[in-house]
Design a protein with these regions (language model features):
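Short beta->alpha connector loops at strand-helix junctions that form conserved
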Residues: 40, 447-449, 468-471, 560, ...
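Conserved alpha/beta-domain cores
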Residues: 92, 517-520, 527-879
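Nucleotide/phosphate-binding sheet-loop regions of phosphoryl- and nucleotidyl-transfer enzymes
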Residues: 1-388, 414-417, 421-424, 431-436, ...
Length: 879
């Protein structure tokens, strides 16, 4: 008989895919002797069975749940649904990966009217019993039936206001009894049925809600953001309740074994007295720092420190630990690898190596490649910060700096981001419903919550700047206003600037400056460089981009797009005159001017390269992109060329194409206008000789774009070789150079063995290769690709991660056929996929020489290349 339910004692940390991350760790902690309340786990197999059976929870699975529930009754000495001594449980989702989009926790399940009275009589504490029941009704209504939580909060606020209470803890048993009646009314009005009194029915509904949450929109969005496979499913954790809301010797908290923002080796966290677990995460009350527990309960604090050390040494990673204190006794409810910033991830990984806990290889595999984005982006410019007006200070929940316009709803934040507006999402507190808005925002600001609230944890995981618990601000999400302590109101669209490292909120925009990296980052990157096989180059067209990339560890230029040099406002008139020239002499006279400009560009790049590879792609776009569209520009051009406006307009119309991206561009320009590529080749070689004569090694790579046939490349190569040889003869010097091609047309992949006869190198232009393979326009595909993801037609954006079965198969074919002709043919990638970690793993497996990407993605590519090499070496998956 297939098994779907497991006692904690039956599991281990290795069973994460079956028991979920939370369940596997509860099992592990039970087995190493930590004080974990007993319970059991419904496996991910049960979730997949539920999904496969049209969202029906089978009787066989529920019978197995009842068997384990009976065992839990024996372990606790309590009976589920028995009024005199009721067993109460918590129900939590538990996917194999931590997922903020999943169902929230339900506490105190098993309470009903009779059990609440029984609990009050048993403990002699009616207030605590009623408080637990009202919390359960709210959680059950919110989580299982999706009744908006604010409806319950409004009822609570009314009673507090009527009695002039400031805190929830001021409510007495009579107040709470009244609140329970109000909550039941809210439930019945929202659902059309009374609040369920049968505990087994409560449990069945909660299990179904967990399974349903696996496919809710929040979870789907989160999985898409983090490339998590939907087939994993989620487990359900059912655990005997312990109570943190039974007075001042009870409480609840979350602690990290190291600081999740900085990586510092110091316990970091928060706790609330007389509260239950979700109070800390929900951010409804502002908690105390964990250090304050030393004064409140020194024995518990000492035991907690021991637990932190034990768990970190057991898992050999920073842990995020959830705990409850019941009448002075510590219980551990959860441990997991703590979400952390990139700075913390790198410091912790390097420190763990230095402490002898893990190897350098393990440290490399431990840091998530995409997290490095956090380290490489701007901070506030110090000079600008001096004039900044601080309007509030909250908790520095996730480091970094951001400036943007404020929006109060996640949906509106997404819409604004799609319009290119820099967004700061402002909320009283965030919830899983806000996940997409958070992902699209530059920063998050909340009035409530602490350093371990939903906003803080999710923002750190995303690498977003976040300030939480900013109680000085009054946020009205309905009226979309932010009231400052001065009485001034800000509205949607107003600018704020946030420093997530200090918690300070500034009025207006503050200029940003480049991030500073070093120390632990450089050490980890040095370890990565020692492991990787792929070289990492940069796509750079300007000296500033190239210099920046070299600081990030680039090993040369993999793509210099010469057309970008032509768009300078001082150069574009000459480019236009060259295109519109009516004779060869007229065109060559303008090309001579452009040649000197290009020589200056190339010389500077060669000097900065200092012997590193520089791959220069010759003119690629269709000519119409350079031509004027505005009437005033056409008139200016006509005057400069001594032509009439109609003459210029007619010529522009002649050059216009119905489908320019598949038209007269790339190498096709060199077939009809060979003088253009000849000029560029001469500029490259002459500038290389200038720099060579300065004592700097130069070995330029000249790349011909859009080649479809061997004959195209052969014709252009011959023309260029003749021009280059003439320079060598004139200058009496010879320098090494290579002529190769971009492989970006499917036909070039199929005939790569022929093209390799003429090419010194292949550089895969995966952007155009993806467009031409799919027949998608990269600029327009976003209009319909979202439907493809939603309907599972495509798993992800093929312009972000290489389509291994289609585009990838063409690349593999070209690699194989190219090497049939030239065994040591140099091959690399210069499309956007060159900076994507998943694609880099694929390119490593193909044995390419290098990948090339934008400057800020160079460190990501370095780490991804090392992880790919280690994955191959040890046959382990990359992160």
């Amino acid at each position: 008989m297939r098994k779907f339910v497991y006692q904690f004692s039956e599991g281990s940390k290795e069973m994460k895919n079956l028991l979920g991350g939370k369940g596997a760790n509860l099992a592990e902690m039970t087995n190493i002797g930590l004080p974990v309340p007993p319970g059991f786990i419904i496996s991910t197999d049960a979730c997949n069975d539920y999904t496969a059976n049209n969202k029906h929870l089978s009787e066989a699975i529920f019978e197995e749940v009842k068997i384990h529930l009976a065992e839990l009754e024996k372990q606790t000495g309590k009976i589920f649904g028995f009024a005199e001594n009721p067993l109460l449980v918590s129900v939590r989702s538990g996917a194999p990966f931590s997922m903020p989009g999943m169902m929230d926790t339900v506490l105190n399940l098993g309470l009903n009217d009779q059990a609440t009275e029984g609990l009050a009589n048993l403990t002699g504490d009616a207030r605590s019993a009623y408080d637990s029941y009202r919390r359960f009704i709210q959680m059950f209504g919110d989580v299982v039936f999706e009744i908006p939580s604010y409806q319950f909060e409004q009822a609570l606020s009314r009673i507090k206001k009527a009695n002039d209470y400031r805190l929830d803890t001021e409510l007495n048993a009579t107040d709470l009894s009244e609140l329970i009646d109000a909550y039941k009314l809210i439930f019945s009005q929202a659902t059309g049925t009374d609040f369920p009194q049968a505990p087994l029915e409560q449990l069945r509904l909660a299990i179904i809600a967990v399974f349903n949450s696996w496919m809710n929109p929040r979870a789907v969005i989160y999985r898409r953001l983090h490339d998590i496979d939907a087939s994993f499913g989620t487990a359900v954790n059912i655990q005997a309740m312990v109570f943190g809301n039974t007075g001042e010797t009870s409480g609840t908290g979350i602690t990290f074994t190291r600081n999740p923002s900085t990586g510092e080796k110091k316990v970091f966290g928060e706790f609330l007295l007389n509260a239950q677990g979700e109070d800390v995460v929900a951010g409804i009350r502002t908690p105390e720092p964990i250090s304050a527990l030393q004064e409140r309960m020194p024995t518990v604090y000492k035991e907690l420190l021991y637990t932190c050390e034990l768990l970190e040494n057991h898992y050999l990673d920073m842990q995020d630990i959830e705990f409850t204190i019941e009448k002075g006794k510590l219980y551990v409810l959860q441990t997991r690898s703590g979400k952390r910033t990139a700075k913390a991830a790198i410091q912790a990984a390097v420190d763990f190596v230095q402490e002898g806990k893990i190897t350098r290889e393990e440290a490399i595999m431990r840091v998530e490649t995409k997290q490095l984005n956090q380290l490489l982006h701007p901070t506030f410019l110090e000079s600008a910060l001096k004039n900044g007006q601080v309007i509030a200070t909250g908790l520095p929940a996730s480091p970094g700096a951001a400036t943007g316009q404020i929006f109060f709803e996640a949906k509106e934040a997404v819409q604004a981001a799609e319009r290119g507006i820099p967004v700061i999402l402002v909320r009283n507190e965030t919830s899983p419903e806000d996940i997409e808005g958070m992902a699209r925002s530059n920063a998050i600001l909340t009035a409530h919550g602490g350093m371990t609230s939903h906003a803080a944890v999710v923002a750190r995981g995303m690498g977003k700047c976040c300030i939480a618990g900013c109680a000085e601000l009054i946020i009205n999400e309905h009226e979309k206003t932010l009231l400052l302590s001065t009485g001034e109101a800000l509205h949607e669209g107003d600018y704020l600037s946030l420093n997530g490292s200090t918690g300070k909120v500034y009025l207006g925009e503050i200029s940003l400056t480049e991030a500073q990296i070093g120390g632990h980052f450089n050490e980890l990157m040095a370890w990565a460089d020692a492991e990787k096989r792929l070289m990492i180059r940069v796509n750079a067209d300007t000296p500033s981009d190239f210099k920046k990339a070299l600081l990030f560890g680039a090993e040369g230029i993999g793509l210099c797009r010469t057309e970008h040099m032509f768009f300078d406002e001082k150069r574009i008139p000459y480019v236009r005159q060259m295109i519109l020239a009516e004779s060869l002499n007229e065109r060559e006279s303008v090309l001579a001017i452009l040649k000197e400009m290009q020589k200056a560009d190339f010389s500077e790049l060669f000097r900065i390269a200092d012997g590193r590879a520089v791959n220069i792609r010759l003119l690629d776009p269709p000519l119409h992109e350079f031509l004027p569209k505005m009437k005033q520009e056409i008139e200016q051009l006509a005057g400069a060329m001594n032509r009439t406006v109609p003459q210029i307009t007619n010529r522009i119309n002649e050059l216009r194409e119905a489908n320019p991206m598949l038209g007269h561009r790339g190498c096709r320009l060199a077939i009809t206008f060979p003088e253009i590529y000849r000029m560029q080749a001469e500029a490259i070689i002459e500038s290389a000789i200038i720099v060579h004569n300065e004592g700097i090694d130069v070995h330029p790579e000249i790349m011909i774009p859009l080649i479809a046939t061997k004959n195209e490349l052969s014709y252009i190569k011959k023309e260029m070789q003749q021009a280059v040889q003439a320079i060598f003869d004139r200058e009496q010097v010879v320098i090494p150079y290579d002529i190769g091609t971009m492989i970006e047309i499917p036909r070039a992949c199929v005939t790569a063995d022929e093209i390799a006869e003429e090419a010194a190198f292949f550089s895969f232009g995966t952007n155009d290769l993806t467009q031409l393979t799919y027949g998608f326009s990269r600029d327009d595909a976003t209009k319909f690709l979202a439907d493809y993801y939603e309907k599972d037609i495509l798993p992800k954006d093929p312009f972000v991660s290489i389509d291994k079965n289609g585009v990838g198969a063409l690349v593999e074919m070209a690699v194989t056929r190219g090497r049939m002709t030239s065994e040591h043919l140099k091959m690399g990638v210069c499309g956007e996929h060159g900076g994507d970690p998943e694609s880099i793993q694929f390119f490593h497996q193909l044995g390419l020489s290098y990948v090339s990407c934008s400057p800020y993605r160079v460190p990501i590519a370095r780490l991804a290349a090392a992880q790919a090499a280690l994955a191959e070496k040890h046959l382990i998956p990359t992160i």
